[in-house]
Structure formats: C-alpha cells, structure tokens
Amino acid sequence: MISIGCPPLSLLPFEEALQMVDGRFEGWEIIAEGKHLLPAIKEELEEAISSHRMKFTIHAPLSDINIGSLNPGIRKEVLDQLVEVVMIAHQLGVERVTMHPGFLSPITFSRRELAVAAVRDSVEEIERRTKGSGVLKCIENMPVSFMTLFTEPEEILDLTDGTSFMLCLDVGHANTTGNLPEYLQHWRRFGSVHVHDNRGRADEHLPTGEGDIDFRMVLDKLKDFKGDFVIESRSVEEGLASRKYIESLNMTAP
C-alpha cells in the first residue's frame, strides 16, 4: 500500500486536506499537529474513517516534541500528548502511530548519554501507559544533524528491543546517515517505511528520482515487506510525482 504523509497539509482545515488526498493515494498518514491535532479532529477523523475506503494512520506531533528532554515538566507534557494520540488512535481503530525519538538540547550536547537515557525511560513509559491498546507504535530513525539521536540501526533496534515498538524506516533519513543498506537488513523489524529522496547531505525531502537513492535496490530488499510505504512529500503534487516514479520502476510496493 502506498500512502502519503505531507506536513503542509496539517496547516489546512481537515476536510480541505482530506479532499486533496482522497482518491489519489490508498492511505494518508496524518501529521497530528497544526490544525490536525488529534483531539481537535477526532470527530472529523472518525467520520472520515467510516465513510472513506482510504487507510488512515497517524504521525504523532513532532514540533517541539522531545522525549529526550531533561526538563521534567516538558517531558511529562510530551509523554501525555503522545499517549493521548495512541489512545485516540485505539478508540478510532487506527492501527499505527509513528513517533520521533527525541533530540539533543543545549544541556545534553556534551552529555549525549543523558538524553539517550531519557528517551529509554520515555519509551518504557509510553509502552506501559498504552499497554493493551493494540496500536502499532513505530519509532523513526533520524537524519544527519548536530541535534539528532538514534541515527544508527543498532541504536534504534536496541531501543525497541523488549518492547512492542517497531521501527519506521525513513529511507531518506538513512541516506543522509550513510547506513541505508544496514537498515534494510533488518526489514522484519519494520512497521512502516517512509519514502523520499535526497542527495545524501541533507534531509531535503525531494520527490523520488530527484536525489541519489537507489529505489530499485530499496524495493528489491523490501519485496517481502507487507507494511505500508508512506511517501513523505512537501506537497500532494510532489507526492504524486514520487508515486509515479516508483511505479515506473516496474516494481510494486506492497
């Protein structure tokens, strides 16, 4: 299944964004921020789920959301929001929520291990508070940046070991960190795959085919993967261009 995840859509009223996506993709990964904060659109989303054949999944809020924060008050608010998203997804029958694994802040730039420990505690708390929800929770690998955590396969796999969390492989992010082939070896641990392109130096979110990622190789390595492919794009039009490129490879994403 090919879905779209398009952050700019979260700045539009939900119904307007839905009309832009409906009938053009099999699924929509809603970015739950801006005008699409899940508590605010819960009723509209429930109606959309019941009246559309499209599959809906959720990308948890990411702006200002840091599960690696050392500030107890901020971290509590972040965890409360993420747990709320998972539980609303459970109530609506949405099967998957994707989250980011936090980032460094001024206090942890020189003590990275403190942020990593906070992330581990956060994952354990989310796991405990959402136990029994039945919602698939995925942690996404991050791109190259002076602020990012969990860019290496062994780090994020170790983070999710012993939990119900799976990995959301972000192909573009892995290209910037130079370890896409290593990530692809662990495809059985993937709950979903994010698709966009870049030239290996920055997280550009280009349409597929405009960067240097070998998507023929990626699709071949993922030929037995049964989860969703989510095209992350800067606009619906670029998302459609990415889909057309993938289909032109004469290889069908699951």
Task: Label each PLM-derived region with a short phrase.
Residues G27, T57, C138-I139, C168, ...:
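Generic enzyme active-site microenvironment
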Residues D64-L70, S105-S110, G200-L206:
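A short acidic, helix-capping loop that chelates divalent metal ions and anchors anionic groups
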Residues M1-S3, L12-Q19, E95, L149-L157, ...:
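Histidine-acidic metal/acid-base catalytic patches
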Residues P72-M166:
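Active-site acidic/histidine proton-transfer and metal-coordination neighborhood
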Residues P7-L9, I30-K35, P61-S63, G102-L104, ...:
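Active-site beta-loop-alpha junctions enriched in small/polar residues
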Residues A17-G23, P39-T57, V86-G93, E127-G132, ...:
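Acidic (Asp/Glu)-rich catalytic clusters
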Residues P13, L37-I41, E77-Q81, A115-S122, ...:
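Soluble or luminal CAZymes and related metallo-dependent hydrolases
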